[in-house]
Amino acid sequence: ARNTKGLGDFETVFSFEHLYAAYRASVKGVGWKASTQRYKASALANIDKTHNALLGGTFKSKGFYEFDIVERGKPRHIRSVHISERVVQRCLCDYSLVPMLSRSFIYDNGASLQGKGYDFAVRRVTRFLTKHYRQHGREGYALVFDFSKYFDTAQHAPVFRAIEKSGIDDRLVALSEYFIKCFGDEGLGLGSQVSQIAAIALPNKIDHYIKDVLRMKFYERYMDDGLIISRSKEKLRECLAALRRLCAEHGIKLNEK
């Protein structure tokens, strides 16, 4: 397990060295953008200004760039943050939120953290299907589910509770919640790294209930899509009832189609 010392301390997380590393990571692959080039031209001065604003409690968001994409057949509205804020969010996520929140994630939470992602989820589902076939042949069923308008309707309160219980200090909690509140009273932004980890974490208790309480070994979730494989249709009906109840408790809309 990763040593969590310093991951919950605001000043340690936002050291100049961490901010510089976050800057280097944030500009990879987007160096062609004019806004990125302007930021890079005075990178050290910009990082120093951000560092002082964070430690002085005066850091503010600069708003969003908005555009639309289609991802895995689903239209997505993106509200991308300014490069200076992307550096801060990268630093916050890499050196605090991701390691602190992901400690409690199930292995089969396949969303795009280090070593995970869409290909990981596909490999796991393929493995589940292979193992099920070896054990039961063609006898079995799959419950496929997804969360309706997940990023648009995600409720903040359960996310805030998870962040507050993660072991980080009050200033890190406040900054994390500030970034999420920038998107309004509900919903999470697809162009925000803090929102991404929040979206991954929000159904964590649902994952644990399906895996640990209902003991469904062949369960995989990739962000707002999930799959459960079982020999028993009745067991999957029990899983569906649990999903409906738990989603309602967490402010998540289960797609009933």
Model feature map: region roles:
Residues 1-48:
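Non-catalytic, polymerase-adjacent accessory regions of viral genome-replication enzymes
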Residues 5-9, 93-145, 149-152:
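Active-site-proximal segment of RNA-dependent polymerases
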Residues 15-18, 53-74, 87, 170-182:
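Reverse-transcriptase-like RNA-dependent polymerase core
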Residues 24-37, 69-79, 106-108:
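Glycine-/proline-rich flexible loop or hinge segments
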Residues 36, 40-43, 111, 115, ...:
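Conserved phosphate/pyrophosphate-binding and hydrolysis machinery centered on Walker-type P-loop NTPases
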Residues 75-106, 185-213:
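Conserved pre-motif C helix in the palm subdomain of viral-like polymerases
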Residues 128-223, 227-246, 250-256:
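Conserved polymerase palm-domain catalytic core
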